[in-house]
Every structure is written in C-alpha cells, then in structure tokens.
C-alpha cells in the first residue's frame, strides 16, 4: 500500500493536478489512497457499485457520481469489505455511505460527502466508465486520483511522491 500526501503532490506537479472542491470526508481505514480511476454514474441505486466491488480492483479507485444525493447510502460495510478483499485501493463517492464504524476499520480508502443509515434501491441502473463531473472536476476513466485527509486530487497520469 502506497502512502500519498496530496499537498506534496500538488507542490511537485502543479501543472498536472486538479484539486476537487473540499466537500469530502475520509471514512475509510486508510488515511490515504490512490490509483487508476474507474467511474460510475448512478443515482440512489448502488447496483453498479456492488458489481464493481466484486471484481478485481488492484491499483484502482472507484469514483462514484451519486448526484450528491443525501437521501441514502451508496456504500455499506458488505460492499466495502468485498472491495477491500478484491484489492481496490478505495472509493470516492459524491453521495453518502453507511456502516461508518465498520468501514473505518476496513483496509480501504473511502471518501464521501456524509453518512446516511438508509440503503439504496437496487434497480440495476447506472453507467460504467463514462466521464463524470462533480466537485469542480471532470473525471475520465484511466486518469489517476489521490486522496488523503487534506483533500482529493486527480491527474492525467500516475504520480510518484517526491523524495
């Protein structure tokens, strides 16, 4: 597991990084995480989040555009544990999560807007690997994302921590 410091990455790569608007909180068991972006666009339906968590995700971060909904949770403990088991580095969710105490103990990076106790409906709706826009940034599959307690940044290519 790599450790990332977003301020250091911003200083080292000012021409490459874009910084997300500061609206996310760190809920996961990892203080920092990063990797190649896989995107999901969904609204109050986490079917695709569950499907992707069940696949191998080594070196990847799931970026979920949940429309900023504060009415239900797109991630809970069971999906988070499955994602960790399958090697995902983390998830950045423009929406809510639940089971926060368990997720805080899970070896997975999780950034989201808030917690909410209600689960989503599973209707099989959503789009995978499409450009998504939130927090002042457009995310494309194959870009790279890095997150820590300071914030979240993206880059068109992988970044190495400065010496």
UniProtKB/Swiss-Prot annotation:
Record has Transmembrane helix as a keyword: no
Cofactor note: Divalent metal cation.
Residues that, per the record, bind substrate: 76-79, 98
Swiss-Prot/TrEMBL catalytic activity: 4-hydroxy-4-methyl-2-oxoglutarate = 2 pyruvate; oxaloacetate + H(+) = pyruvate + CO2
Superkingdom of the source species: Bacteria
GO biological process: regulation of RNA metabolic process
Gene3D superfamilies listed in its UniProt record: Ribonuclease E inhibitor RraA/RraA-like
EC assignment: 4.1.3.17, 4.1.1.112
Residues that coordinate or bind a divalent metal cation: 99
Keywords assigned by UniProt, alphabetized: Lyase, Metal-binding
UniProt GO molecular function: 4-hydroxy-4-methyl-2-oxoglutarate aldolase activity; metal ion binding; oxaloacetate decarboxylase activity; ribonuclease inhibitor activity
Membrane-crossing residue ranges in chain numbering: none
Known cofactor(s): a divalent metal cation
Cysteine disulfide partners in this protein: none
Family listed: Belongs to the class II aldolase/RraA-like family.
Assembly: Homotrimer.
This protein's name: Putative 4-hydroxy-4-methyl-2-oxoglutarate aldolase
């Amino acid at each position: 597991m790599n450790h990332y410091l977003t301020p250091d990455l911003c200083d080292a790569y000012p021409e490459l990084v874009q910084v997300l608007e500061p609206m996310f909180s760190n809920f996961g068991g990892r203080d920092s995480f990063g990797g190649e972006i896989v995107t999901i666009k969904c609204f109050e339906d986490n079917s695709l989040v569950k499907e992707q968590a069940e696949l191998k995700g080594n070196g990847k971060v799931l970026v979920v555009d949940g429309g900023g909904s504060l009415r239900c949770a797109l991630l809970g403990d069971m999906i988070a544990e499955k994602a960790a088991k399958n090697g995902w580095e983390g998830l950045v969710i423009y929406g809510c999560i639940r089971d926060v105490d368990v997720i805080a103990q899970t070896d997975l990076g999780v950034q989201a807007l808030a917690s909410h106790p209600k689960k989503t409906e599973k209707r099989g709706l959503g789009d995978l690997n499409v450009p998504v826009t939130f927090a002042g940034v457009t995310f494309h599959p194959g870009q790279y994302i890095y997150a820590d307690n300071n914030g979240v940044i993206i880059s068109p290519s992988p970044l190495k921590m400065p010496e």
